[in-house]
Structure formats: C-alpha cells, structure tokens
Regions:
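Catalytic/RNA-binding core of pseudouridine synthases
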Residues: 1-234
Length: 234
C-alpha cells in the first residue's frame, strides 16, 4: 500500500463520532505507522454524529477522487418517529412539539412516500453545514439566530417502507448527493399532517460500496499492521 500515492478505504462510521473525528483518527494511525508528520486524508461525504455506516476515506493523491465519490448515489435505512418534531430534525435536540398520529395508516404512509420519489425541492436543516453569508448554518442555529436556507433540487430514486409500527416507521432511501435524510423526515411528517424526526440512520451504500465492505474504525490500527506498506520518500 502507498498512502501518499493514494489509497481508498471504506469504514463503518461509529455512532456519535463526527466525520472529522474519523478522518483525524485514520490520519493519526497512518502518520504513526509511516513515521511522517503529514499525510493528506479526507472523506467523501459527511455523516451526522448520530448516523452510522459507509464512509469513504481517501489518502494522498486519491483525495482528488473525493468529488467523484460524492456524486455516487447513496442508500440509507432511516428510522422515523412520527408525531413529534425537534429543532435539529433528529435526536441532537429535545422534542419541541407533538402532533396527532391517530389518523395515520400504513396505506397512507406508503402513498405519501411515493410523492417523494423523483426530482424534489428540499430545504436543508438549520442544523447543517450549509453556508449562510459565509457562515455555517449550524453555528448560527446553535447561537439561536434565525436561519433561512434556500431549497435545493435533488433526486430521490427509491423510497421503501420497511417497517410500520406507529409511532415509528423504518424506510429505505436511495438518493442523490446533497440529500438530508433529517429534512426528508421533517417533510414526510408534514405530508402526513403530523410531525416527524429521525431517531436512527445507517448509510448502507455509497455507489457500489456496501456496509459489508467496510471495516470498523477501531480495527484499523491492527489491520494497518498486517499491510505491506511502501516507504514514502519526500
């Protein structure tokens, strides 16, 4: 392996880790193994701390491929709680409002999900990395500032209802770059004349890379010790 020439690695991001923390950990392990102070490492698509699943990490010259990987379609398994919302649209923030769910049926959910397939407009969450006047939306939102984000055009290829167990539903989503599953949860809740927030999210695929192709971050150091590493000459 030659981490300077470039390697592409697949990880299952642990729960509560930021994407940045995963990159830092991998960079630290590689730098230590190679005995170098600097090695270029980056990820090809952020996952929220409360999400797990496929994260592609590129090293060295392979970081030039990050954009290519970002444009691959992604598949998620999402768990939504209906009848309640949070400011972050997930469990990062406490429930701020509750709504009725008595009128919701399985058929209603299935019909509603169909409306989200295809090209749609989605307003990103205020608690997101989108920029507003050069500042990250989540920095403004956490300070309590009003954040107004413009809708983005994106594509949902597939949505499938996997489990229906009110107030919880589980869905599989195949979508394009830039889709916020948290925002999709918000919109599904509204379309059901209720509310919803995300209680669990797993990214199961990025392009052809599946969850079963990924290694655990905690196993990386031991895995690295088993590899034949080419010496880096600056």
């Amino acid at each position: 392996m030659n981490f300077k020439e470039g390697e592409v690695l697949y990880f299952d991001k642990p729960l509560r880790w930021t994407s940045f923390a995963v990159v830092n950990k991998i960079r630290y392990n590689i730098s230590r193994k190679l005995g170098v102070k600097k090695i270029k490492v980056g990820h090809a698509g952020t996952l929220d701390p409360l999400a797990t699943g496929v994260m592609i990490i590129c090293t060295g010259k392979a970081t030039k491929r990050i954009e290519e990987f970002q444009y691959h379609t992604k598949e998620y398994i999402a768990t939504l709680q209906l009848g309640a919302t949070t400011p972050s649209f997930d469990l990062e923030k406490e429930i701020d409002a509750t709504y009725p769910t008595d009128h919701i049926t399985k058929e209603m959910v299935e019909e509603t999900l169909k409306k989200f397939v295809g090209t749609i407009e989605q307003v990103p969450p205020a608690f997101s990395a989108c920029k507003v006047d050069g500042k990250r939306a989540y920095d403004l939102a956490r300070k309590g500032d009003e954040v107004e984000l413009k809708p983005k055009i994106l594509v949902i290829d597939e949505i499938e209802l996997l489990e229906y167990n009110l107030p919880e539903i589980k869905i599989r989503v195949v979508c394009s770059k830039g889709t916020y599953i948290r925002a999709l949860a918000r919109d599904i809740g509204q379309a059901l004349q209720s509310g919803a927030h995300l209680t669990g999210l797993i990214r199961t695929r990025v392009g052809e890379v599946k969850l079963e192709d990924c290694m655990k971050v905690e196993d990386f150091e031991a895995w690295l010790d088993q590899q034949e590493i080419e010496v880096i000459n600056d």
